[in-house]
Amino acid sequence: MGSDGTSAATAEAAIVPGQAREVWKNTILAGLANYIDAGSIVAGSAALALWASAYGLSTSFIGLLGAFSANAISAGVGALIGGRLCDRFGRKRIYQYDMLFYAFGMMWLVFATAPWMIVVGFVLVGLAVGADIPASWSLIAEQAPTGKRGKHSGVAQVLWYLGPVVVMVMFFVLAPLGLLGARIVFAHLAILALALTLLRSRMKESERWTQAQEEAKRARLAGEASAAISPWRELMRPKHLKSMAFLIGMYGMWNLWAGTNGFFFPYILSTVGNQTQAVSVGVQALNFGLGIVSIIFIFMKFADRVNQRLLFAISALMQVVAMALLAVFPLTLPVALLHVVLGGIAVGFGAQSFFQLWSSELFPTRIRSTAQGVTFAVVRFGLGIWSFFVPALTATGFHTLAWILTGFLAASGLIGIIWAPRNEGKSLEEIEAERSATA
């Protein structure tokens, strides 16, 4: 990347303790998008049974909510639009003001009194969280020091899992309040989004993005041929298409499992497994809590230092075994707990964490957020289409659905094991130089 890479590498080498604290603070502020995204998904899932009972929602309508929620199509559209805007106007503009839009959407869920209001709220919230993901993930990768990018990405993933834990604990406490308790949970997410808007206003723009813009401007003034290539045309180059195909395959297959498990698991437990609402959300909270422990003590500790492909393979195998338990055995609370413990540990250093890391590493700064937005959008679109049919599949036999989800995890694992990159310990500039040399 020429001067961009040189200056960025110099800046990394010059980081002092005070600056390091600032970088970590920015990582947390950017990563809170993950808290809000995952918290929104799980809050909606935990409220699903309550809404179904209060409004007499049909199986088809429940599928519609899943398809257009923050977990699927709406988030995909938001990521597609937000990713391109991030590369064009900067990361800060998107991640600062996007949370206001999120709060507006969440208020529809807080005050929803009819099914159509729930749909509107889900769509608006999904658009907002989708737009924020490329902005926050790009910023985290671009400001992280070389050799610590996985650790900084891990912080965002901890927040991704912390959101559901907080939401689930709140549902435990507020369960006697029924729908009022759900409204309180949604309100806490809206308030956090407003606070995050204020805190993010003090953050600086990504230095790498600023340098990339300056370099592009110099190239245009010099009449260089590379300056005439549009970002979309650049994204369509074979090496980038291959990277997107890998990411979509690996994360897309995994997300079909995760999206179904995350959005419908409490619903499945309370209907098919005949567990109470409190027990179902408690089991899910345990899953996310184990994920946090796994991220901190496995992913953040080893992702920058060991063979990432091997780390991914171990996680993939554990998740396949965990999901197969639900396919083979009757859906009882002990089986669900074993599934949660084994799978919860595995997901912390698996596809979700590596998707954030690899999607930030495999594309140059000029198109990084755009590429992340495209891959994220395709994955969420696929999940949205799939989610529409999950309630009907569950009604015809949960074990059939469990076998299908086991197959998704196996496919994701194979794709990751075969094509995973080896970027541990490298700077973004080193990765780009290597990819340019082999293109």
Residue ranges with predicted function:
Residues 1-42:
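Cytosolic juxtamembrane N-terminal segment immediately preceding the first transmembrane helix
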Residues 45, 239-292:
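Extracytoplasmic gate region of multi-pass secondary transporters
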Residues 45-77:
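Extracellular/periplasmic helix-loop-helix junction of adjacent transmembrane segments
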Residues 79-90, 294-307:
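Helix-to-loop junctions at the C-terminal end of transmembrane segments
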Residues 90, 111-116, 329-331:
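Helix-breaking motifs and short loop linkers at transmembrane-helix boundaries and internal kinks
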Residues 93-107, 310-324:
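Structural signature of the two symmetry-related core transmembrane helices
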Residues 121-158:
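Cytoplasmic helix-loop-helix junction between adjacent transmembrane helices
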Residues 149-175, 192, 376-386:
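Glycine-rich segments within core transmembrane alpha-helices of 12-TM secondary carriers
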